[in-house]
Amino acid sequence: PYVILHGAKHGKELDVLFEKADFAVGSLARHRSGIQNIKTLKNREYAARGFGFIYSETDDDFEKMPYILKAPADETPIEISKVIAFCKKQTTPPQEIRDSIRNLSWKEQMKKVYDSI
């Protein structure tokens, strides 16, 4: 099987599943609640773990990343075959994905605050 839904998982149980995963699913269908722009912790965790992922909202920190697959922010069904094809052609190594978000660390974000005061 290509897609397995496990329900809510936390801690070590979640870590075990991440070890088996190839790709992640971020927020989808947020347009239903009127949200178009968002910065989810979920997206950042996936990148920190070295995963490519799909999401539908606008997250300026990831919009141009090569390891991202964007879904339309509407009711269009997501074609799993397109997700699988994206994963198969994905060449960004996990460490490169992790490195791409170094500027999002608490240290870097707090430096921006400190420098502005």
Where are these regions (language model features)?
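Active-site donor-binding acidic/aromatic loop of nucleotide-activated sugar
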Residues: 2-10, 17
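A charged, aromatic-enriched C-terminal amphipathic alpha-helix characteristic of glycosyltransferases
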Residues: 75-78, 88-117
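Short amphipathic alpha-helix with an adjacent loop that forms part of the alpha/beta core around
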Residues: 16, 83-86
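A conditional alpha-helix N-cap/helix-loop micro-motif detector
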Residues: 6-7, 36, 73
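Localized chelating/binding microdomains
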Residues: 14, 19, 44, 49, ...
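Structural motif corresponding to alpha-helix initiation and N-cap regions
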Residues: 8-12, 40, 77, 107
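Nucleotide-sugar-dependent
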Residues: 12-17, 24-47, 54-65
